[in-house]
Swiss-Prot record:
Pfam families: Gln-synt_C, Gln-synt_N. GO terms for biological process: glutamine biosynthetic process. It comes from Mycobacterium tuberculosis (strain ATCC 25618 / H37Rv). GO terms for cellular component: cytoplasm; plasma membrane. InterPro entries: Gln_synt_N (IPR008147), Gln_synt_N_sf (IPR036651), Gln_synth/guanido_kin_cat_dom (IPR014746), Gln_synth_cat_dom (IPR008146), Gln_synth_gly_rich_site (IPR027303). Keywords: ATP-binding, Cytoplasm, Isopeptide bond, Ligase, Magnesium, Metal-binding, Nucleotide-binding, Ubl conjugation. This is Glutamine synthetase. Belongs to the glutamine synthetase family. Its EC number is 6.3.1.2. L-glutamate binds at residues 241, 298, 304, 316, 338.
């Protein structure tokens, strides 16, 4: 048995852990969990835990549903919730999903991302990610479709006396850091009740695990604080939606492959081609980075979110931004993709972003001129004249672009690609047939 497994088993005994929660994610990004007793973990390390894959969104047909979860000891963390006596009785690990013969499950989002990271490794790169995760903190209420109520009326960077959101963020960060998830900073975002917590850079697979843990922790802490948290992309029509701005960089060993001291923006040819790849394939990957009907209520003109495939230095109206906070710091040269929302599947999102960027690097895509103006203020004609393609404005148009994409099919694999399209086509059809309160208010008098 390797040292990581021995460490986990020893920690369970020393800290008297009573429950080990084995986590994995379905294709749509929902967290799944099975709890086992510590005495069963050594066997789980050796043989895995069998489950019905046909009961998990996108995993398997009922006729071939035997699936196995293998805990990854490198992801072991004690959960931060304690009993009244202060005893932390539960821990968690993420799992890799396989078929009974030991082959990887093509439906496992971790496997989808790992395949892209392997491809990056074959090109000599490792990928690091730093997300800015936004969400809403709401007052308790029924989940019956009624209008939610934010916990406050604060705005961007606001500091209030007896600020419930401030207390919430402090408790959430304590819980995250207890689990070894480093937080860079946190603050109130622009809309009432809207929060942002930024996680410190990590390798892409660890970060996807961290994002899933983050969403779980945030919801748990919100309940403890007498509130509820929502990662819905756009719960309020009159306010900005919740993004997951995704900062990415490629490293060759310890060297940032995106940095060049000779460039005015300190951006290397690798970095430029990576951005060009994101822009070229932006429409194709939108259904993954923004997977819900509601996602496209956020990606609208004036909504503080990108609507065209453009890039710029320090330009927050562009799809891809090159942050310029520390222009001469080699390790910090990165690109920020501003379209993903915080309700995406982080494994699939990082996979398609990496696939698009690597395609640009492999094929030597040439990056066009940067956007120096506010892209939101440009007319459609001006955008076309500048070569900025419009991003999909609905889930339907995003699915059409994805369906024709060889890149996304290759990045996700045939199984996930086909399931995702079928599932999202059903979601769109259900939405189209639904009569909304807006329609009743507007058209009932006809």
């Amino acid at each position: 048995m390797d040292r990581q497994k021995e460490f986990v088993l020893r920690t369970l005994e020393e800290r008297d852990i009573r429950f080990v929660r084995l986590w994995f994610t379905d294709v749509l990004g929902f967290l799944k969990s099975v709890a086992i007793a510590p005495a069963e973990l050594e066997g789980a390390f050796e043989e895995g835990i069998g489950f019905d894959g046909s009961s998990i969104e996108g995993f398997a047909r009922v006729s071939e549903s035997d699936t196995v979860a293998h805990p990854d000891p490198s992801t072991f963390q004690v959960l931060p919730w304690a009993t009244s006596s202060g005893h932390h009785h539960s821990a968690r690990m993420f799992c890799d999903i396989t078929m009974p013969d030991g082959s990887p499950s093509w439906a496992d989002p971790r496997h989808v991302l790992r395949r892209q990271l392997t491809k990056a490794g074959e090109l000599g790169f490792s990928c690091y990610v730093h997300p800015e995760i936004e969400f809403f903190l709401l007052k308790p209420g029924p989940e019956d479709g009624s209008v939610p109520v934010p916990v406050d009326n604060a705005g961007y960077f606001d500091q209030a006396v007896h600020d419930s959101a401030l207390n919430f963020r402090r408790h959430a960060i304590d819980a995250l850091e207890f689990m070894g998830i480093s937080v860079e900073f946190s603050h109130h975002e622009g809309a009432p009740g809207q929060q942002e917590i930024d996680l410190r850079f990590a390798d892409a697979l660890s970060m996807a695990d961290n994002v899933m843990t983050f969403r779980y922790v945030i919801k748990e802490v919100a309940l403890e604080e007498g509130a509820r948290a929502s990662f819905m992309p756009k719960p309020f029509g009159q306010h900005p939606g919740s993004a997951m701005h995704t900062h990415m960089s490629l490293f060759e060993g310890d060297v940032n492959a995106f940095h060049s001291a000779d460039d005015p923006l300190q951006l290397s040819e690798v970095g430029k081609s990576f951005i060009a790849g994101i822009l070229e394939h932006a429409c194709e990957i939108s259904a993954v980075t923004n997977q819900w009907v509601n996602s496209y209520k956020r990606l609208v003109q004036g909504g503080e979110a990108p609507t065209a495939a453009s890039w710029g230095a320090a330009n927050r109206s562009a799809l891809v931004r090159v942050p310029m906070y520390t222009p001469h710091k080699t390790s910090s040269r990165r690109v920020e993709v501003r379209s993903p929302d915080s309700a995406c599947n982080p494994y699939l999102t990082f996979a398609v972003l990496l696939a698009a960027g690597l395609r640009g690097v492999e094929k030597g895509y040439v990056l066009g001129p940067q956007a120096e103006d506010n892209v939101w203020d440009l007319t459609p004609e001006e955008r076309r004249a500048m070569g900025y393609r419009e991003l999909p404005s609905s889930l339907d148009s995003a699915l059409r672009a994805m369906e024709a994409s060889e890149l996304v099919a290759e990045a996700l694999g045939e199984h996930v690609f086909d399931f995702f399209l079928r599932n999202k086509r059903t979601e769109w059809a259900n939405y189209r047939s639904h009569v909304t309160p807006y329609e009743l208010r507007t058209y009932l008098s006809l």
